[in-house]
Amino acid sequence: MRILGIDPGLARVGYGVIETAGREQTMLDCGIIRTDSGRPEGERMVEIARDLRQLIRAWKPELAAVEKFFFYRSSNTIAVVQARGVVIMTLSRFGLPIVEFPPMQIKQALTGHGHADKDEVLEAVMRELSLETPPRPDDAADALAVALTGWFQR
């Protein structure tokens, strides 16, 4: 199964694509969709949707896993939530099944406890995907963690 993991954001959307076969998981791609902070939010969201469509067409995932947020405390967070809505809409337009996980559930799935720090999650991602070097940037590594959680929680 091919899974696209997404770590939503307005400035950077992390993505990670994994392929699973039996008990093996392989990283196919990871990176970020970066938007220019000097452009209007609407244009940035159009850019996110466009680049995400390209990723979906290129990798043809069978499942999308997206990090879910629960707390909205600042105007910056509102923009992230809006960008997440663009991600969900774009995935839905391709008819992809979508699973969503809050950060604590992702940490639990990868490390066995929901209060893991970033380094513990990164180590788990590297172990599960047999990576010798950490995926960069952090948003891409986070997206791979989301994709792995999608696989583990299926």
From Swiss-Prot:
Residues that bind Mg(2+) 1: D7, D139
Cofactor note: Binds 2 Mg(2+) ion per subunit.
Organism the protein comes from: Synechococcus sp. (strain WH7803)
GO molecular function term, any single one: DNA binding
Binding site for Mg(2+) 2: E67
Lineage of the organism: Bacteria, Bacillati, Cyanobacteriota, Cyanophyceae, Synechococcales
Subunit organization: Homodimer which binds Holliday junction (HJ) DNA. The HJ becomes 2-fold symmetrical on binding to RuvC with unstacked arms; it has a different conformation from HJ DNA in complex with RuvA. In the full resolvosome a probable DNA-RuvA(4)-RuvB(12)-RuvC(2) complex forms which resolves the HJ.
Example of a GO biological process term: DNA repair
Active site: D7, E67, D139
InterPro entries found in the cross-reference section: RNaseH-like_sf, RNaseH_sf, X-over_junc_endoDNase_Mg_BS, X-over_junc_endoDNase_RuvC
Keywords: Cytoplasm, DNA damage, DNA recombination, DNA repair, DNA-binding, Endonuclease, Hydrolase, Magnesium, Metal-binding, Nuclease
Gene: ruvC
GO cellular component: cytoplasm; Holliday junction resolvase complex
Enzyme kind, highest EC tier: hydrolase
Localisation: Cytoplasm
Entry EC number(s): 3.1.21.10
Protein name per the record: Crossover junction endodeoxyribonuclease RuvC
Record-linked Gene3D superfamilies: Ribonuclease H-like superfamily/Ribonuclease H (3.30.420.10)
Family the UniProt entry places it in: Belongs to the RuvC family.
PROSITE patterns membership: RUVC
